[in-house]
Structure formats: C-alpha cells, structure tokens
Amino acid sequence: VYIASPYKVLAVRESQRKAQAISIAQQECLKIMRECEGFTPVSPILQFSYLDENKHRDKALQMGLELLKACDYIYLSKHKDAKYSQGMQEELALAKKLGIKELVLELPL
C-alpha cells in the first residue's frame, strides 16, 4: 500500500516541515499495519527521508512515483492539511490512471 501523505503543504515552520511530515507518514504506516493485516505500507517520505528537500525534491518526487507504480493500493492520509496537497492529488491521479485501487479505511471516530 502506497502511503500518500502531505509534505510541502504542511502548515508548520519550514524548519519543522520534514520532521512533521515524517511523523505523519509513520502514523499512517502504523495505521495500515494495524488495520490491514497482510498489507505492507510504503511511504516515499520515509523511504527517501535521507534526501535534501531543497536539492533533491524533483528526484524524490520522481522516485516516489516509481514506488507508486509497484503498489497494488494507494492510501491517502487523513491529516488536516492533506486535502490541500497538490502532490497527493497528483499521486492519486497517477494511481487511477494505472488502475491502482484507493484503500479507504472506515474507522470509528
């Protein structure tokens, strides 16, 4: 399961963005691990966290899309800033184009 979660759109200080994005991605991966037995969550934010956002953003986005192509499902983060994420919308559009199903969890509030 490809985990699409927000990064650039996060409403935090620039100095806190990477740490916040990693934390959100970790939470979403743990959610899939707990709720979807037999599914393996993968996150481009976690996978490529060693890259410098300022120097390698385009390469990270490209590698993330390659990672998506290898997945059977895409899961969209429910973080409050996610609905404004252009990157997540692009990931979802590619997933739909490739026939990758969106995984939707119906969790109680």
Language-model regions: role of each:
Residues 1-109:
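Catalytic phosphate/metal-binding cores of nucleic-acid and nucleotide-processing enzymes, i.e., regions
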